[in-house]
Amino acid sequence: MQVYVDYRDVNSISNKKTLAYVNNFVINTTQFLNRFNYLCEQKLCDISNHLQKLEITMSLLEIKLGSIDGLESLPSSANVPVHNTQPTTQQNTPPPPTAAATTSSNIPPPPPPPPPPMTGVPPPPPPPPPPPISKSNIPPPPATQQNTQESDDDDEDNNNNDKNNNNRDDEDDDDETSSQAPPPPPMPTLPSSQSLMDNLAAVLAMKKQQRNPQPPQPQPQSPSPQPPPPPTTTSSIPVPPPPFSGANNNSDDDDDDDEGPSLSIPAPPSMMVMSGNNNSNSNSYSNNNNNKDDDDDDDDDDDDDDNSISIPKPPQMDDIMIPAPPTDLFIPAPPSIRNYDDADDDDDDDDESW
């Protein structure tokens, strides 16, 4: 129920309030429209971006499909779903002929329709092919081609005979090979005594090389300037005289024993002077076999090979002169202390027995 209001009794609104109301309404409406416009533009931008991505994806898909060979030759109805295409009996059966049609035309009535196929039963097999035409039913060829046909028949007969003969020969060979026993395996070949001796000699040679390795060859020395050699003497250094020792003096009055041994220094051995003229035998030394040694090694291995180790000659050097020791060196003997006139109780006979 609507309440009736009489606006004549209501006080009028002032112009200022009316203006304020209208301004608020316009401002709110404008803000709403601006907001709606902004949202619509944002949605349109998103939709355009999605459409652009979809176009790019479709172009890539077209490129990939275009790179596949033989895709265009496929039938266009390959993706169409296959429905049941078996004809129904109601659609295939023609309508029954009327009596007027049968009486007016002399055409015999059509045969009765075949029974409907049962589900799950395979269809009947197709009829067999017609029998091949025999040679008797073939009409004779013309006279111009009779000779060529006869020659071809002869060639075929000859080929068939050759094939039959080859098959018989193969069967005979198979029978013969099956009847024969397999050949015995070959006897193993034993190594000969000569090859064993050669192998033994090679092993012994390797052992000798390991025992007597070849010394490294000295590298040639570069020539260096040498001073002129001093005059050499072929004679040896004279032996110095023995040191002077005092004669035994038994007539002295001291109590020392003059028969005591005197201390003397022996003469040094004569020094050999090295000269440039050396015997040719010093250039190399041969390693002779000694079968009379007391060691337990097998000297027969050394007799098998007369290899000798050659030692190279040392480089020539200047003569070395060694001076003789001094001859005036004399060391006196220590004095012996004895007292025969002592008053002790020891036995002096022990001292006299010296």
UniProtKB/Swiss-Prot annotation:
Residues 150-159, 251-260, 293-307, 342-354 have a biased composition (Acidic residues). GO terms for cellular component: phagolysosome membrane; WASH complex. InterPro entries: WASHC3. Gene3D superfamilies: 1.20.5.110. Residues 277-290 have a biased composition (Low complexity). Residues 76-354 are annotated as: Disordered. GO terms for biological process: actin filament polymerization; exocytosis; phagosome reneutralization. Coiled coil: none annotated. Residues 107-143, 213-244 have a biased composition (Pro residues). Belongs to the CCDC53 family. Probable component of the WASH complex. This is WASH complex subunit 3. It comes from Dictyostelium discoideum. The gene is washc3.
